[in-house]
Every structure is written in structure tokens, then in C-alpha cells.
Amino acid sequence: GCDISEQRLPQDGAITIKDQSQGGKDTDVRFNVVPTKYGERICMRLLRASNIMPLDGIGIPERDLKKFIRAIESPQGMVLVTGPTGSGKTTTLYAGIQHINKPETNIMTAEDPVEYTMTGIGQIQANETIGLTFSTILRAFLRQDPEVILVGEIRDKETVDIAIKAAL
């Protein structure tokens, strides 16, 4: 959440807009606020769970898509999805998780924030303010016997080390 009285520090937040229309879907709004010389600047993203695209609809060339599917369906290993803001990392990750999500597969995610809620997935939102860091979450995951772990961000060496251990 955000503290609206704090205008000196960058902040992240989220709200859900409830669609009251018949058959409407709720929309999550994620936002980031930064202080600038001329006042606060905000960037907002609108997210709908129904917008999780299938893997074959996200624009990966077919040859590369086959390699990606083979990698995410592998029982071991690590797949890194990298790129600048707005390049499709989140879209790719969620499409990949959706592709392999089956009731018998234990999938755990560590995210900041959880951008789309997915049925059957153990999603945990990191919260460094209370000590719930990516490395803390990953250590807990290792005791949950997951087949798949998604880490939204790798911010430090400790998280790298645990992620590599989990991938082996």
C-alpha cells in the first residue's frame, strides 16, 4: 500500500476496480509514484486475469517457442526471462506458468507484486518491510517440494544461490 502523506519517497501500490456490470471482470491497477521536482509522477498498469495470453499468442517465433516449452517442461533446470521494462517478461512468465499449470503439479511463485492471481498456484508476494524477502520465500519453497518455482526478481547473491540450488 501507499502512504498518501509521504511525497518524498517512491512508492508502489495496487487497487482493484470492481466491475459491477453483468458478467464484468474486476481490474487490478498497479501503480508506481515517484517524487519529481514539479510534483509526483504516477505510472499505472491495468491488469485482468483474463488477459493471460497463451504461449503461442505472445509473439515468440515458433522455433524459439518450441525451445522455451521444452525448457519449462523439463523436470530440472533454470529458465531466466530478462529484458527492460515493458518488454514482455511478465507476459512470458505468466503464459509459461499457465502452460504447465496442472492440478498435480506443485507450482510456487515469489513475486513483487503478484500481478495475476492464478488458480492452483502457490503465489507469495514479497514484502521486504516485514522481512519476507525473495531469499526467505525461496528457502521456504525448498521445504514445500515444488516441481516448479517462479521467482519474479533476483535481487541479491543469496537469492541467486538458493535459486541455483533449487534448479539442480
Regions found by a protein language model. Name each.
Residues 1-87:
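N-terminal "pre-motor" subdomain/linker immediately upstream of P-loop NTPase catalytic cores
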Residues 69-79, 90-168:
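Switch/coupling sub-region of P-loop NTPases
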